[in-house]
């Protein structure tokens, strides 16, 4: 028995297919989903969705959003997403360096919108790197 999985971003259908198992980065931690899962809606954090089909794992970098789980169907609506195998690791690593440089300009306790933006960019770059390497 398989789960029907759809990952949708505003400008594209990122992934549509079946999976035996799905692991989502929810805002409260990793959420493992198997066929017959209880119905729920959850917020998705910046992180990596992992799906298993035929003993093969595939990773998708997610940039925050929501997921709806209904028994054997998972619909993930995100701000943006990239399939791990399509991510250019060098570009993601460069984005991480730039975000870390941007954050180094602020003190540890400083609250600034630019610092918050840089922290978010670090999370995005790390998710992209992790998805690309898995």
From Swiss-Prot:
SUPFAM superfamilies with a match to the protein in the record: Epsilon subunit of F1F0-ATP synthase N-terminal domain (SSF51344)
Pfam families per record: ATP-synt_DE_N
Single GO MF annotation: proton-transporting ATP synthase activity, rotational mechanism
Domain of life: Bacteria
Location (main, coarse): membrane
InterPro entries: ATP_synth_F1_dsu/esu, ATP_synth_F1_dsu/esu_N, ATPsynth_dsu/esu_N
Membrane association type: Peripheral membrane protein
Localisation: Cellular thylakoid membrane
GO cellular component, one term: plasma membrane-derived thylakoid membrane
Family membership noted in the UniProt record: Belongs to the ATPase epsilon chain family.
Quaternary structure (record): F-type ATPases have 2 components, CF(1) - the catalytic core - and CF(0) - the membrane proton channel. CF(1) has five subunits: alpha(3), beta(3), gamma(1), delta(1), epsilon(1). CF(0) has three main subunits: a, b and c.
Full protein name: ATP synthase epsilon chain
């Amino acid at each position: 028995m398989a789960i029907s999985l759809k990952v949708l971003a505003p400008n594209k259908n990122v992934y549509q297919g079946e999976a035996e198992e799905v692991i989502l980065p929810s805002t409260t931690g990793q959420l493992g989903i198997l066929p017959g899962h209880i119905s729920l809606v959850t917020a998705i954090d910046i992180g990596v969705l992992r799906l298993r089909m035929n003993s093969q794992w595939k990773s998708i970098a997610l940039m925050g959003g929501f997921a709806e789980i209904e028994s054997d169907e998972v619909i993930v609506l995100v701000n943006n997403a990239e399939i791990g195998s399509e991510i250019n690791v060098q570009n993601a690593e460069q984005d991480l360096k730039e975000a870390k440089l941007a954050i180094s300009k602020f003190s540890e306790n400083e609250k600034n919108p630019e610092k918050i933006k840089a922290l978010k960019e670090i999370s995005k770059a790390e998710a992209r790197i992790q998805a690309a390497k898995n």
